[in-house]
């Protein structure tokens, strides 16, 4: 994957209809650049309060819905109309607020599988191994962010 380190590289990709925030096969982003762009697009999820966080969350969920396929990543069932319930955080917003608006931290799941991920046996889910790799990647990147 190509490592994006500045805004010009990011904009170049966007102009060519690539989305480095989601396209992990082709791109990696410097974590500082990723966080800067996420804050611009969705707002400050960590430092905001009340209505600001709710508005930022709504912008984020709608953006994810617009940029990811409208099917459950677990059972592949088509999902017709937008609902924030379909956007399932891999790592919870409460425990990892700095990752709340990272699109890599979201699975599109039907209500049943969203509930399974939150409250059921995650290890039996088809998405489990991919999510574990994503958790490791995100935790390492955000840990590096704190060192700067």
PLM feature spans:
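Cys/His-enriched microdomains
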Residues: 11, 70, 108
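Charged phosphate-binding loop/patch that engages nucleotide di/tri-phosphates or the phosphate backbone
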Residues: 130-148
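Short, cysteine/histidine-rich loop/knuckle motifs that typically chelate Zn2+
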Residues: 73-76, 112
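Short, charged surface segments at domain edges that flank catalytic/cofactor-binding sites
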Residues: 17, 23-74, 97-100
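Histidine-centered nuclease catalytic patch
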Residues: 76-108
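Short Cys/His-centered divalent metal-binding micro-motifs
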Residues: 80, 106-129
């Amino acid at each position: 994957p190509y490592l994006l380190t500045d805004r010009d590289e990011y904009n170049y990709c966007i102009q060519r209809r690539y989305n480095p925030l989601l396209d992990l096969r082709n791109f990696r982003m410097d974590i500082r650049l990723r966080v800067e762009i996420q804050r611009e697009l969705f707002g400050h999820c960590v430092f905001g309060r009340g209505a600001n966080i709710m508005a930022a969350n709504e912008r984020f969920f709608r953006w994810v819905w617009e940029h990811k396929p409208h099917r459950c990543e677990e059972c592949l069932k088509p999902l017709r109309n937008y609902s924030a319930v379909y956007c399932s955080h891999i790592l919870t917003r409460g425990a990892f607020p700095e990752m709340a608006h990272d699109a890599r931290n979201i699975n599109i799941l039907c209500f049943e599988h969203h509930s399974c991920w939150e409250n059921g046996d995650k290890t039996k889910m088809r998405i489990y191994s991919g999510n574990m790799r994503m958790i490791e990647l995100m935790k390492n990147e955000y840990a590096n962010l704190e060192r700067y």
